[in-house]
């Protein structure tokens, strides 16, 4: 048998750290203002593309949920905080700094949701939470099914919010759209704005707004 040898030259290198920022907005709760619900996505992307699905879609979901709540005059019981995280792709610095600040300020975070799986048709949500909390969330399925949510399971929340769970044991939730086309685009040159469907993107925001409303209304 012949031996195949492959030679590869790469020119990647580590550069010195620079300053980045999370972008944070919130709607203050009217009944339990000290209880915080976080909704977010991350700002950065790989340099070979526009980051339209990863994670431009999550950023749009976050902003659209906030816009819709403000547009209808929704007054939450609990504080809803909208976070666009910095540096998810190669360091998780934004998520880590957010959790560290929450711990330092002794904030009470009851739930955190991230959208970081693309802007495709909604399919469900996944959790990092106790079996009891996942079971409680599943009782909401009939309310969300008309809008596309078909499943809720315990396969984990998002990466940016994971430090909240590690440091403060906050229950996590990840938005799960249809995954069939995600790896045609993920970290690839094809992850561009033209490959985002506006209707699918907005359906994701609808489902995220729905579960945030339920957590705000009933707690978690």
Regions found by a protein language model. Give the residues of each.
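His/Asp/Glu-rich mid-to-C-terminal helical/loop segments that flank catalytic regions of hydrolases
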Residues: 67, 71, 182-220
């Amino acid at each position: 048998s012949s031996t195949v040898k492959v030679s590869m030259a790469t020119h990647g290198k580590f550069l010195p750290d620079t300053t980045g920022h999370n972008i944070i907005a919130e709607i203050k709760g009217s009944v339990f203002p000290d209880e915080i619900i976080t909704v977010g996505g991350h700002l950065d992307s790989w340099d070979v593309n526009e980051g339209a699905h990863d994670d431009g879609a999550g950023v749009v979901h976050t902003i659209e949920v906030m816009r819709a709540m403000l547009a209808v005059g929704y007054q939450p019981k609990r504080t809803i905080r909208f976070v666009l995280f910095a540096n998810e792709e190669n360091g998780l610095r934004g998520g880590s700094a957010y959790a560290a600040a929450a711990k330092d300020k002794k904030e009470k975070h009851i739930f955190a949701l991230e959208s970081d799986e693309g802007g495709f048709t909604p399919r469900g949500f996944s959790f990092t939470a106790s079996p009891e909390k996942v079971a409680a969330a599943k009782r909401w399925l009939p309310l969300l099914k008309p809008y596309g949510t078909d499943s809720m399971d315990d396969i984990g929340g998002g990466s940016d919010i994971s430090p909240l769970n590690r440091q403060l044991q906050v229950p996590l939730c990840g938005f799960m759209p249809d995954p069939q086309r995600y790896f045609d685009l993920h970290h690839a040159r094809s992850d561009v704005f033209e490959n985002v469907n506006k209707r699918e993107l907005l359906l994701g925001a609808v489902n995220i707004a729905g579960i945030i409303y339920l957590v705000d209304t009933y707690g978690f």
